[in-house]
C-alpha cells in the first residue's frame, strides 16, 4: 500500500484498494515526487454513495498535496461545502455553460490545473464530453483522470490526446475498476 492508499482509507473514499478501487496506487506513482509542486486539484463528482464522509476524496487530496487548493464540483447542491483549502460548486457536467463556468469563474483561471479527476456521472457520454470541453484549457503537463471508465472512452479520446488506461489486472473485481489518464500531446 502507498501513503495515498492509507490517506484514502482514512477518509473512506472508494479510490483505495482497501475499500474498492486501486486508483490511489496509480495516482501515487504519478505524483509521489511532485506532491509539493501541485497547486490546483479539481474533482468532478464529490458525492459519496456509500457511508462515509461527503467529499472524502477532496479531504484526501488536501492531505496528500500540502500546498494545493482543492476544488470540487457536483450536480447535487445539497452536498456542497467549504473547508480549509477546499471549495465546492454546483456543476452539471452535461452542460456547456456549467463546464465553462468551472474553468473561467469558479476556479479562476482554469489553465493552471495540475490534476483534474472526473468521478462524476460515470457515463461514457458525460466523460467524453467533459474531457473534450476541458482538456483544451489545461496546461501541457496537467493530468486529466477519468475514473470508473468504460473501454469505449479510450477509442474516442485517443486521436486527440495521449491516453493511458490503468486496470488492476487480476485484482480487478469491479467492471468499473478502470482509470483513464489523459494528457496533452507533445
Residue ranges of predicted features:
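A short alpha-helical cap/connector motif
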Residues: 1-117, 121-146, 150-186
